[in-house]
């Protein structure tokens, strides 16, 4: 569960650059309904949200006009080639359903992770500035987790390496990024195999 005050503050500050691992069920195809945000209108929403885990990707891969997007629409794409459905498959019905999901680099839109790493190397202020936002998110979630640090689950090695380099005092796990060339069934089992100890 997440408190109303935590939810409201996260939504107001980070609703356009983060979300929760909560989706409407698929309908006619595996990719269907990932963009349906009506799940966030559920009157029992706060009970379904989970401050124990935070999924962390590297940076926003698309949506340069993210400020105009509805709250929580990140990681909920309706694009025909999206892979968000794999993350839905891996988390739905598990203890990871309803967890917070965000990017460690929020305001640098780029699909090529090597370019992101190069930009950080050239301008360390990118990571310094973004870490302030990320740490604020973690503190807000901590307040809804009995004062305990949430477990951080990196989505891919790039996010994992940044977390290990810059974040201390947290359990940090690593899973494959959902954009990889594998099925949703494989990805769900990957979660089971990789995250069984948390």
Where are the predicted features?
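Short, aromatic/basic amphipathic alpha-helical patches
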Residues: 163-169
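Alpha-helix capping/helix-boundary segments
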Residues: 158-160
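Short, flexible loop segments at boundaries between secondary-structure elements
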Residues: 169-198
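A polyanion-binding, active-site-adjacent surface
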Residues: 2-150, 166
């Amino acid at each position: 569960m997440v408190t109303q005050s935590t939810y409201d503050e996260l939504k107001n500050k980070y609703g356009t650059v983060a979300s929760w691992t909560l989706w409407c069920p698929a309908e006619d195809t595996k990719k269907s309904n990932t963009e349906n945000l009506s799940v966030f209108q559920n009157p029992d929403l706060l009970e379904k949200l989970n401050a124990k885990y935070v999924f962390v990707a590297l940076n926003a891969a698309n949506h340069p006009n993210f400020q105009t997007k509805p709250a929580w629409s990140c990681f909920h794409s309706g694009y025909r080639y999206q892979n968000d459905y794999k993350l839905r498959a891996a988390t739905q019905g598990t203890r990871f359903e309803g967890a917070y999901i965000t990017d460690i680099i929020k305001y640098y839109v780029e699909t090529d992770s090597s370019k992101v790493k190069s930009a950080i190397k050239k301008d360390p202020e990118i990571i310094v500035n973004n870490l302030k936002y990320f740490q604020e998110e973690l503190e807000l979630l901590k307040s809804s987790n009995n004062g305990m640090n949430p477990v951080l689950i990196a989505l891919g090695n790039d996010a994992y390496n940044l977390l290990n380099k810059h974040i201390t005092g947290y359990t940090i796990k690593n899973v494959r990024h959902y954009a990889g060339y594998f099925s949703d069934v494989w990805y769900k089992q990957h979660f089971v195999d990789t995250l069984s100890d948390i």
